[in-house]
Amino acid sequence: FKAKGRAVYGITLGDIVFDTPDLWSNMKEAMANRNLTIFQTIGNHDHLKTETSDDKAAANFESQFGPRNYSFNRGNAHIVSMDNVFYVGGSTPSSNYKGGITDQQLEWLRQDLSHVAKDKLVIFCAHMPFRGGTSETDESHMNHAGVLDLLSEFAEAHIMIGHTHYQQKYIHTRNGKKIFEHIHGAACGAWWTSTLCADGTPNG
């Protein structure tokens, strides 16, 4: 694949089977036939809504794919995937989660990045957008500002995000450094209702 210029790995950005954990095995079987390694990022729809705590709600995802926070290197890039969805329980989909990074997660990220050379490209993957969320008083963006501070220490940093179902680019300026946030459209496009687009965007 590499010699032909094709991707040698991929990464999802959450909401993989849309509240249907019984489909994990089908999804894994389908991805196993792609002949490339695929890393997973957890989204709000990957949490079990029958649970009442964040850790319990994410346990099923972790049993399928491993830790929600991890990192790896590819070439000159250091890639981090983190869970920035707090599942808090609730009666409606809009009230059962919030966005952000815990203090413990932020410390994990700080320690992880301390082993990365400052001239490296850092790619940070999560589910919920950072754009507009740099205030520590905003409970939907807790510690996102701290993440941006850490990313600003590197030569180049990009944030890869899902969640919103539409494409958007946002540029954060942090400590004099530009950090690019890429919000990616969903594979289902306009909820499977529009004309099929073979390259995957904008309509799935």
Question: Regions from the language model: what does each represent?
Answer:
Residues 1-25:
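N-terminal active-site segment of His-dependent metallophosphoesterases
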Residues 9, 37, 121:
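Residues at the starts of beta-strands that form the adenosine-phosphate
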Residues 13, 113-134:
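Short acidic, glycine-rich surface-loop motifs adjacent to enzyme active sites
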Residues 14-15, 43-44, 127, 162-163:
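Active-site glycine-centered loops adjacent to acidic/histidine catalytic or metal-binding residues
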Residues 17-18, 46, 130, 166:
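Short active-site segment of divalent metal-dependent hydrolases/proteases
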Residues 21-118, 138-158, 169-204:
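Extended active-site neighborhood of metal-dependent phosphoesterases/phosphodiesterases
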